[in-house]
């Protein structure tokens, strides 16, 4: 999926809706950054996505300059500064429209928000302080790391090191 049809598949899903809404622009959020170029085989890349056009619509591969942790930092900072909760939907495991808060992507997002001094509960992710033990066990015993997940978790780890005064 990632190496061949990721971007075009997502854009293909957006095309009928863009047509119905008479939209001339579709944004696809970046999965990786320019520093990841060539390291991770992914068919969702600005050199491909930005050239996909259909009907009167063009595609913009957005946020390529930001890591996932940078994006979490920006969202967290905005939500705290504006005193507005923002419900994120990051989970692909849950079929009910909410985050399961038990999968790798939910855990990664929870930890990323905590690293930015945010409260995951304000972002649609259920979290209690004692959940950190469950997450730690998951990372240690169940998580199968690959080149992609290692980079994401290292960014989170780096933010915790930078924000050592987090309560």
Where are these regions (language model features)?
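Nucleotide-activated chemistry modules centered on ATP-dependent adenylation/adenylyltransferase
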Residues: 1-167
């Amino acid at each position: 999926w990632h190496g061949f049809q990721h971007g075009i598949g997502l854009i293909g899903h957006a095309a009928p809706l863009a047509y119905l809404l008479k939209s001339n622009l579709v944004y696809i959020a970046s999965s990786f950054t320019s520093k990841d170029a060539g390291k991770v085989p992914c068919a969702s890349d600005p050199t491909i996505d930005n050239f996909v056009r259909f009907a009167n619509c063009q595609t913009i591969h957005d946020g390529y300059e930001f890591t996932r942790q940078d994006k979490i930092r920006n969202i967290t900072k905005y939500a705290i500064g504006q005193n507005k909760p923002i419900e994120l939907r990051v989970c692909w495991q849950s079929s009910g429209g909410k985050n399961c808060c038990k999968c790798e992507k939910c855990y990664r997002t929870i930890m990323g928000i905590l690293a930015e001094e945010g409260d995951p509960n304000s972002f649609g992710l259920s979290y209690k302080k004692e959940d950190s033990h469950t997450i730690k066990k998951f990372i240690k015993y169940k998580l199968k790391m690959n080149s992609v997940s290692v980079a994401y978790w290292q960014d989170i780890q780096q933010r915790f090191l930078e924000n050592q005064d987090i309560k």
